[in-house]
Amino acid sequence: MNVGNISTAMITPFDSKGNVDFQKLSTLIDYLLKNGTDSLVVAGTTGESPTLSTEEKIALFEFTVKEVNGRVPVIAGTGSNNTKDSIKLTKKAEEAGVDCVMLVTPYYNKPSQEGMYRHFKAIAEETSLPVMLYNVPGRTVASLAPETAIRLAEIPNISAIKEASGDLDAITKIIAETPEDFYVYSGDDGLTLPILAVGGRGVVSVASHIVGSDMQQMIKNYTNGQTATAALIHQKLLPIMKELFKAPNPAPVKTALQLKGLDVGSVRLPLIPLNEDERLSLSSVISEL
């Protein structure tokens, strides 16, 4: 499954009443595709999936597939902590025409490694789509062990993982012990270059909303052997990568887009907009790019 080097974990635009704004989404998609994005993740965590209804998610899948019109792969966030519900949503995503699904590790109910294995296996067996796993223990509490990820990689259509554990030893083990066509993506913008250095494919990114073209240049320099230049770009981008997570995601990146002249609306409760100090800090970092 080739979804490129930079897959943007796309925000969901809202109007002034908090409804999904599809006109703003159309504008956002075109903007992202012109600024370094190789593929789009729809209705993931950055897309505020916890506060989107099932109907809204399906509408987002359908609209994005139609709007993208084959220009880049579309990845649907269909994971949850309910296996049956994930299967249902995955089937709806497949009907909508997406190219891949992303499945987050089950949150809150804290399954065992065997439970997570069976969960992902059950969903993968119900779809013909490629599956990208998503390990983000900082949000889910339960962490997918590298041994479990390696075992899951044996399932034919489980073909990638977004790794946001921050554990480079575990990530290296996954890369070393899975097939060459099983791709490991960084789930943390700031670890993109280190994960490339141990054999990773790229990043599922939030920062690419703002600095996608710069990130593409960093990856290009690295893959062309210009590692010192790649390191300099990494150092330049690290402040904005960190700033975008100083408040709960995606409030900072939505504000950053607004500061760049792209109105995408606010966030849904229980998330709240940035306060004035946070906004000023973000604006200062952006002005130095």
UniProtKB/Swiss-Prot annotation:
Pathway: Amino-acid biosynthesis; L-lysine biosynthesis via DAP pathway; (S)-tetrahydrodipicolinate from L-aspartate: step 3/4. InterPro entries: Aldolase_TIM (IPR013785), DapA (IPR005263), DapA-like (IPR002220), Schiff_base-form_aldolases_AS (IPR020625), Schiff_base-form_aldolases_CS (IPR020624). It catalyses: L-aspartate 4-semialdehyde + pyruvate = (2S,4S)-4-hydroxy-2,3,4,5-tetrahydrodipicolinate + H2O + H(+). Keywords: Amino-acid biosynthesis, Cytoplasm, Diaminopimelate biosynthesis, Lyase, Lysine biosynthesis, Schiff base. It comes from the Bacteria. It is found in: Cytoplasm. Its EC number is 4.3.3.7. GO terms for biological process: diaminopimelate biosynthetic process; lysine biosynthetic process via diaminopimelate. GO terms for molecular function: 4-hydroxy-tetrahydrodipicolinate synthase activity. PROSITE patterns: DHDPS_1, DHDPS_2. The active site is at 134 (proton donor/acceptor), 162 (schiff-base intermediate with substrate). GO terms for cellular component: cytosol. The record marks 45, 108 as: Part of a proton relay during catalysis. It is an enzyme of class 4 (lyase). Pyruvate binds at residues 46, 204. Its main location: cytoplasm. CDD domains: DHDPS. SMART domains: DHDPS (SM01130). Homotetramer; dimer of dimers. Belongs to the DapA family. HAMAP family: DapA. Catalyzes the condensation of (S)-aspartate-beta-semialdehyde [(S)-ASA] and pyruvate to 4-hydroxy-tetrahydrodipicolinate (HTPA). This is 4-hydroxy-tetrahydrodipicolinate synthase.
